[in-house]
């Protein structure tokens, strides 16, 4: 008989499932490379036995009703444990009742361990087994019980679950070091639980809970994974300020140091590139928004900020060693933040002392605020300075946080990356991060007004952590989050379960910037009651739309679809000024091509090339917008006609499955109630928006056609200008040829004169040597006579030469020699007459092969 039977005999109360779980826990895959027979190895993990009295008390306690939610305290960002792949079905609530652990708890512990082992990937199985073996070591040391809260990262808020799924557990621990044996059931060894005394436990039981039964959505992986964190039923002492728990970041699977850590990191990077179907949403959402997720992230970010402030108080030699670990909100993955966030790097100005610079900055800001209040308003609703726009002089702009303003003697100017706007409010809240959106004592539920009025959250250069929080809080699909994070460049409209996603392009409109006309991607997530916008560059469209909303609030029903239309319309209108400037440039260049003769041809060619480049850039930006608007309008018409989206893609099929799962889950869990009439139906644009979209499409088509016309003008002007340059080059060559011809004529006239003077200058007896001076005048007169005669003869021959009438004749004349140009050309009529005479003549003695033809002219 194998060792498994002996272990079962030693434990008569152990069920078959427990024996199987113990057998699976005892496997060590790292020690075996071949086939493995688990029956050859004994069970090494003993099972705890509880007395019947404790068992009965624990079962009686497990049927107690849950305490309602009162206040938010424990968050899943405070401590995170990555245990592996655990099914996400069923809620596990563990509360301390001052008693031990019975066999039922041990049974579920072993079953959970078996599930952990069976669902784990092979690369992590060897690493998970040694940790699981430590979870079930029998402790002989009796310590007073304690409140241990273990919360799964994504749990169900169901108060009517059975005692098998919701077994209440109490784990005992003391103030002894961590080296003592632990009794927690499903807690990984990496989670260190602080110990408390019995008196503290009872005092905590008497105090109300701050946060209970908070629910979050499930996380998706290759196997349905569950990240276990602190329990939702954990009780926190609100009055005890000295016992504050240090927040712990969520540990990813790549954070464990083991033999297969590198393989785990590679596997995690592979999983991040793959989008999985969304599991059923298990959150308690209000108008589609999970405010608990935002509150938890805000508490986590504030705790990390306070930790950063505390690190500033350490000596200077420790600052530089910890600066890489404390600065910023870095994510737990390999990419700590978005690369586009570098565009918003704060400007640094060196100061003498940190305290003095901070005080001076505060005094200067107070003076500016007082000056703005005293200054009379010339035009109501319009203010200047501090980058404000019309109607935003009362905006809630939080002051600079000392965590960012001063560090190591430098002052930073924090950019506002988040803007929140509500249709029923005249103020726009600007903040540098998500926690700064709410003021002290305010919650996100109050900020969004429960999500009932139309809200708008604008995010500029979101980090990975912020993007993850927003995706979970607003139910954004992983495909949409991936498109935003990877900055998808294709313009499109996609329909999802609870929203539709629009990707649209704008451009940098600052003419002084070196990135002028560079495309900027704008991503719009349109929900039923609000809009989310993301961009990775500074744009002014959001401020323009907010000003437009304030002006038309009394005339237009401002909803999420109208905000999306207004933003697209403002992006489209931003192309008009640039296109108009190109129109003026095209007219000026077209006139300059035929009129300007003395201008620099290099500057003119550069001007034409720059204008053509701008035109082609705008055409590329506008090329896909008409199709997007057409698709958008079609969706609106389908909504008006009552036609739903076709199930022609994997995305819609996955959304339909997720909707069915959500419906079945809501039907089965009657205790989880949504406080409003939020129904998870497929979201489509409103039908009345199609009329406005038609106007945008007309503008896009008109601008694109104008750009096509301007591009043709620039192309024709470029060709004409090059032709003008060629004509001017031919004219210059002709002038040079004429000048050389005149010089040659003068030289020809002087040659015979040199002959005559040379003859009389010879040392021989010449006529008139001994007589009068009349010979000298006679010779001079003959020379002048010859010169005048030669001049008249040359002028006669030059007049008989016909100037070139065409460019081909000019080219032929330029190719001829100077002497041949003086030969007179025959008259055209004479040439035609001679050809006719030759044609009428009889047959000649020449052969047919010697006659020119179209086949032999090039031989």
From Swiss-Prot:
It is a multi-pass membrane protein. InterPro entries: Alr1-like, CorA_cytoplasmic_dom, CorA_TM1_TM2, MgTranspt_CorA/ZnTranspt_ZntB. Residues 1-20, 157-176, 330-339 have a biased composition (Low complexity). GO terms for biological process: intracellular magnesium ion homeostasis; magnesium ion transport; monoatomic cation transport. The modification Phosphothreonine is found at residue 242. Gene3D superfamilies: CorA soluble domain-like, Magnesium transport protein CorA, transmembrane region. The modification Phosphotyrosine is found at residue 77. The modification Phosphoserine is found at residues 85, 185, 188, 220-221, 236, 850. Keywords: Acetylation, Cell membrane, Magnesium, Membrane, Phosphoprotein, Transmembrane, Transmembrane helix, Transport. Residues 28-42, 55-73, 144-154, 193-203, 353-375 have a biased composition (Basic and acidic residues). The modification N-acetylserine is found at residue 2. GO terms for molecular function: inorganic cation transmembrane transporter activity; magnesium ion transmembrane transporter activity. The keyword Lipoprotein does not apply. One of its GO terms (cellular component) is plasma membrane. PANTHER family: MAGNESIUM AND COBALT TRANSPORT PROTEIN/MITOCHONDRIAL IMPORT INNER MEMBRANE TRANSLOCASE SUBUNIT TIM8, MAGNESIUM TRANSPORTER ALR1-RELATED. Belongs to the CorA metal ion transporter (MIT) (TC 1.A.35) family. This is Magnesium transporter ALR1. It comes from Saccharomyces cerevisiae (strain ATCC 204508 / S288c). The lineage of its organism: Eukaryota, Fungi, Dikarya, Ascomycota, Saccharomycotina.
